[in-house]
Amino acid sequence: MIANGNGAGHRAGLDEPPGHASTSFRIDPDRAALVLVARSNAGPITFGATGIEGSISVHVAGGEVATHVPPAARLEVPVQRLTCGNGLYDAELLRRVDARLFPRAVVELQGASPIGATGRYHVEGVLTFHGVTRSMAGTVAVSFPEPGRMVIEGEQVLDMRHFEITPPAVAMLRIYPEVRVQLHLEADTAHP
């Protein structure tokens, strides 16, 4: 708690009076990555993609996201960039997710609330992948390592069947439907 001018306490950044402007951040595609860790009958297979684009609008106070002003974000993941380095596996994954027909996965933030004073937030939004839109919820860590830079990290387990995707199979290899998704984003203050 921090004492304000009238001697009353408030939580820095969380109970600021409404009306403060949000700060817009632009995701740096060179510093943003998505990692999918799929389990298979032959062990884990890791697919990754860079080049994530999008924007984030948040009110920052005291080095934290102040959620009294609802944050907003939209991320676009280029599905065709998903790769594990094995051409056969890559081709099968891109075929199963119909990457030519659905070249981007889109995440739209709809709400966030702090989890104590930990720098972690419960987030809710929608994910559109393979032409299917689903509500999602999870936890992300947010930090501001330097002025004008935001770092977001999160992890979530998704079932590909919820997006009408048949789990990939190549020869004797079978990939299980639940996939661990890890996200790392770095964003800089957007300048008009």
Regions found by a protein language model. Name each.
Residues 1-192:
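Low-complexity, acidic/polar, glycine-enriched regions of mature
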